[in-house]
Swiss-Prot record:
This is Probable GTP-binding protein EngB. It comes from the Bacteria. Mg(2+) binds at residues 33, 54. One of its GO terms (biological process) is division septum assembly. Its cofactor is Mg(2+). Residues 18-187 form the EngB-type G domain. The gene is engB. It comes from Ureaplasma parvum serovar 3 (strain ATCC 700970). Keywords: Cell cycle, Cell division, GTP-binding, Magnesium, Metal-binding, Nucleotide-binding, Septation.
Amino acid sequence: MAKFIKSAHYFDQYPIDKQFEICVIGRSNVGKSSLINALANKKIARTSNTPGRTQLVNFFDFNNFRLVDLPGYGFAKVSKEKQTDLAAIIDQYLGYRQNLCAVFQICDINVLTNDDVEMSRYFENQKYAHFVVLNKLDKVNKSYFNNNKHKIAKFLNISTDRLLCVSAQNNINIITLFALMKKVVIQAKQEKILSKKEEKMSSEEEIK
């Protein structure tokens, strides 16, 4: 059963273990908290109509993995000093968190911005997987995504197989998204096991 664990400002306040983590990040007010609640099938994340409400790193337990909610980029309605602080919080998590196995970038399907493009490009050469989730599908007509997914993928510089559309409000494709997250974690675990085996074999060869 999914549940909230803790909020953290500093790196040394993060949970200390080897549990794999999936991070969700997006511009302020794209519906990250609503999406987390939809995935949990209950309210475990605070929602707000005020952009920039999430200003800490929030950790949620989803049994087989942790879901981590980062502050929204774009930093609407906060001071320059706070913008610098939030950017540092995001950078320290994305740059140094060893538990991180995948990032799901949440975007508003109605409003894609240059901030979204810049963030997507940031993930190009990272060691963890990167997916884009287009939220608020309920706000567009049914054929919009299929008619525009190649254009959207090109704009965000991502392949169409790493693009998913959902509606947190109406629970559209939430089960599909959760299944993808679990699949990514399973793959990360398998890769870690394989890596350990290869390290062991290499060590044994050196001893010989």
